[in-house]
UniProtKB/Swiss-Prot annotation:
Keywords: FAD, Flavoprotein, Oxidoreductase
UniProt similarity note: Belongs to the acyl-CoA dehydrogenase family.
Keyword Cell membrane: no
Coiled coil regions, renumbered to chain: none
The keyword Flavoprotein belongs to this UniProt entry's keyword annotation: yes
GO CC term (a single one): cytosol
Catalytic activity from the UniProt record: a 2,3-saturated acyl-CoA + A = a 2,3-dehydroacyl-CoA + AH2
Protein name: Probable acyl-CoA dehydrogenase FadE25
Cofactor: FAD
Catalytic activity, EC: 1.3.99.-
CDD domains linked: SCAD_SBCAD (cd01158)
GO molecular function, one term: acyl-CoA dehydrogenase activity
């Protein structure tokens, strides 16, 4: 009697071969060029220049840039894979490809062809970086209450105000900036602009001192009569808030991917350590309590990865109503990352609480994934509104 051998050609929930090849390539690069510097990057809170060089030279710094602008034209799932694999060894370095997408997605979705040609090739071929400026000190979750203003002045726009929590601030060449152009129209009076680091009246504040992702600078941005050309507006005046929300629908899965990578890195470290660590004359991986913790950790990571890839695939297809799945993928994956990294530290015992091992760094880095691109409480607001409308 011949047993059933399965149907190898059944490809539902199976990534295409080119995605697997990309994963292998970026994993090899991350382990060789990025991982050896991760602990020092964290300890010294310095930008991961080695990672930037490696990602730029291999084309992984901004894989999402369309081919017509000199990029690889990688789809949303492939972009998530790149971010995930870099985050598996260094969350700070993973913010290079992640924030390059965040800082350009509004332009890709709503910008003019001329503006795209001005900005995107610099990221694709010249190693430039981009950041996203939405939040302000008094306009965080309530982003529509922002106070930064933009006023038309002939063929230019004049920006005044300040933005905060800008990831990779001071390292980026281009910034997508949201500003109020019509104060009387609320959210419909907000517009989006591309600001260059050398624009008159634009300055970057000092770096924040943070719990985690210490290698990625977080700064304020200041606009003091910042003058930019009139064609640097993204879309029509008053459409900026819609552009901001559409951007987040496409980029929240990338934060989910970062969270999955952090969790996977912690899980990998925990598995290796529990196999090696001996107590009571045997490896602690033989103890059922440890086995159950590892099983739960792996189960959560796998579920988070599938949700992130599903959200990214739906975004790539251009499906409407991405709000729920994008928020869910970011929210679930980041909660998983916090749980898994905490359990990884627990499995290491006292050793996990020291900087001799990477799990404490993974745990500190995981926390931000529950906060940026909308706190997980806001993600639940987004999801519940989608369910109840």
């Amino acid at each position: 009697m011949v047993g059933w051998a399965g149907n190898p050609s059944f490809d539902l929930f199976k990534l295409p071969e080119e995605h697997d090849e990309m994963r292998s390539a970026i994993r090899a690069l991350a382990e060789k060029e990025i991982a050896p510097h991760a602990a020092e990057v964290d300890e010294k809170a310095r930008f991961p220049e080695e990672a930037l060089v490696a990602l730029n030279s291999s084309g992984f710094n901004a894989v999402h840039i369309p081919e017509e602008y000199g990029g690889q034209g990688a789809d949303s799932v492939a972009t998530c894979i790149v971010i995930e694999e870099v985050a598996r060894v260094d969350a700070s370095a993973s913010l290079i490809p992640a924030v390059n997408k965040l800082g350009t997605m509004g332009l890709i979705l709503r910008g003019s062809e001329e503006l795209k040609k001005q900005v995107l090739p610099a990221l694709a071929a010249e190693g430039a970086m981009a950041s996203y400026a939405l939040s302000e000190r008094e306009a965080g979750s309530d982003a529509a209450s922002m106070r930064t203003r933009a006023k038309a002045d002939g063929d230019h726009w004049i920006l005044n105000g300040a933005k905060c929590w800008i990831t990779n601030g001071g390292k980026s060449t281009w910034y997508t900036v949201m500003a109020v152009t019509d104060p009387d129209r609320g959210a419909n009076g907000i517009s989006a602009f591309m600001v260059h680091k050398d624009d008159e009246g634009f300055t970057v504040g000092p770096k924040e001192r943070k719990l985690g992702i210490k290698g990625s600078p977080t700064t304020e941005l200041y606009f003091e009569n910042c003058r930019i050309p009139g064609d640097r507006i993204i879309g029509e005046p008053g459409t900026g808030f819609k552009t901001a929300l559409a951007t987040l629908d496409h980029t929240r899965p990338t934060i989910g991917a970062q969270a999955v990578g952090i969790a996977q890195g912690a899980l990998d470290a925990a598995i290796a350590y529990t196999k090696d660590r001996k107590q009571f004359g045997e490896s602690i991986s033989t103890f059922q309590a440890v086995q159950f913790m590892l099983a739960d950790m792996a189960m959560k990571v796998e579920a988070a990865r599938l949700m992130v890839y599903s959200a990214a695939a739906r975004a790539e297809r251009g499906e409407p109503d991405l709000g729920f799945i994008s928020a869910a993928s970011k929210c679930f994956a980041s909660d998983v990352a916090m749980e898994v990294t905490t359990d990884a530290v627990q499995l290491f015992g006292g050793a996990g609480y020291t900087t001799d091992f990477p799990v404490e760094r993974f745990m500190r880095d995981a926390k931000i994934t529950q906060i940026y691109e909308g706190t997980n409480q806001i993600q639940r607001v987004v999801m519940s509104r989608a369910l109840l409308r």
